[in-house]
Regions:
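Acidic (Asp/Glu)-rich catalytic clusters
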Residues: 68-74, 97-102
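Histidine/acidic residue-rich metal-binding segments in metalloenzymes
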Residues: 94-261
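Short, surface-exposed connector motifs at secondary-structure boundaries
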Residues: 45-50, 76-80, 104-107, 179-186, ...
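His/Asp/Glu-enriched, well-ordered alpha-helical/loop segment
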Residues: 158-186, 233, 254, 259-261, ...
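A glycine-rich helix N-cap at a beta->alpha junction
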Residues: 70-85
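Metal-associated gating/positioning segment near the N- to mid-region
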Residues: 8-72
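Divalent metal-coordination and catalytic microenvironments
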Residues: 9, 20, 41, 45, ...
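Gly-rich Lys/Arg/Thr-decorated short loops/hinges at beta-loop-alpha junctions or inter-strand turns
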Residues: 18-21, 46-51, 78-80, 152-161
Length: 331
């Protein structure tokens, strides 16, 4: 049986893969749930997503993990999930990574709560290296931050706020790149936003560390000025930074320092986002607009070819998590 599809003038691409989404399920489903999240993913061209573990309860046990995976099977896409690195996101005691892997965890992350204890991170990386799994890190040292979600710079000065400096990200990226080099662990630097962090990932890769990096569409399209125009809708962790940072992110995409585009799709309710800037939660949606932003901001200006964009949105994320998707094959 042979079926021929006339695709002249069209682009044939694999289903997109997003390794960083928040579907808020269980426990926070007034914001989003697995089914509405999967629908948004499908509308944006994504056929595989990896959910983060910061739900209520946290995905630090097999029961909660199984719930997410079973609900995911009821959708029209492949819904995978990371489990937490630390129990209760407390950064003190490691989860049963081996057991959670056997139960179906795609990898591990405490995304949303940066891990502050260096020796604990080293221990987790050693275990991840033994198990040949991926650890993903939210890199923001809270000791440098007074108001998260807004870059510490000209816009925060205008608003009279001490925000989140790039140093908060840079310091943890440097730490974790070096721990990854020492342990041989495979790690993902999540939602990279600082130009200096891009430079450190570039150096770590040259040194032989198994460091991957992801960037969001909002970080390669917008700057901190968006906060003045859009208020809480432009508040996210890490924050939008300067035009220099944005250009450095694009350079990182061009030279392969940044391997993946991931949305960090993080919906909140309308009521939450209507709160004052310093009180509203951080987060922005992205699944439905990611591909369009990539084409408009990266392909059309000539930064990436369409094939390179597809690699960063399908092949590379699938390769990181050893998924059987993200490529076009016969069969």
């Amino acid at each position: 049986y042979e079926q021929v599809i006339d695709a002249q003038g069209l682009v044939v691409a694999p289903g997109l893969v997003d390794v960083h989404v928040h579907f808020r399920d269980p426990g926070l489903t007034y914001k989003e749930d697995i089914h509405t999240g999967a629908a948004a993913a499908a509308k944006g061209g994504f056929t595989t997503v990896v959910c983060m573990a910061n739900t209520k309860p946290i995905v630090d046990n097999e029961e909660t993990l199984r719930y997410v995976l079973e609900e995911g099977k009821k959708t029209g896409i492949h819904v995978l999930s990371c489990a937490a690195i630390s129990k209760g996101f407390e950064g003190k005691e490691r989860t049963d990574m081996e057991g959670l892997l056997k139960a179906g965890a795609a990898g591990f992350t405490d995304d949303g709560i940066p891990l502050m204890d260096g020796p604990f991170v080293k221990e987790a990386m050693e275990e991840a290296a033994r198990l040949d799994t991926v650890l993903s890190f939210h890199e923001e040292d809270k000791t440098f931050i007074k108001q998260n979600g807004i870059n510490h710079g000209k816009v925060s000065d205008q608003l009279g706020i001490y925000g989140s400096p790039a140093l908060a990200e840079d310091s943890l990226v440097a730490r974790d790149c070096m721990i990854a080099l020492a342990t041989g662990a495979k790690i993902d630097i999540q939602h990279i936003s600082s130009g200096h962090s891009v430079e450190m990932v570039r150096l770590a890769k040259k040194m032989g560390a198994h460091v991957w990096a992801e960037v969001t569409p909002h970080h390669f399209t917008l700057t901190e000025d968006a906060v003045l125009e859009h208020g809480t809708l432009a508040k996210m962790n890490p924050p939008l930074r300067t035009e220099w940072d944005r250009q450095m992110l694009i350079e990182g995409l061009k030279d392969g320092t940044i391997d993946m585009i991931a949305t960090d799709h993080a919906p909140h309710s309308k009521e939450e986002k209507e709160k004052p800037l310093t009180e509203a939660p951080s987060g922005i949606t992205g699944l439905e607009t990611s591909l369009a932003l990539g084409i408009t901001s990266l392909v059309k200006p000539g930064h990436l070819s369409l094939t390179e964009l597809m690699e960063k949105m399908s092949l590379n994320p699938a390769t990181l998590y050893k998924l059987d998707c993200g490529r076009m094959e016969e069969g």
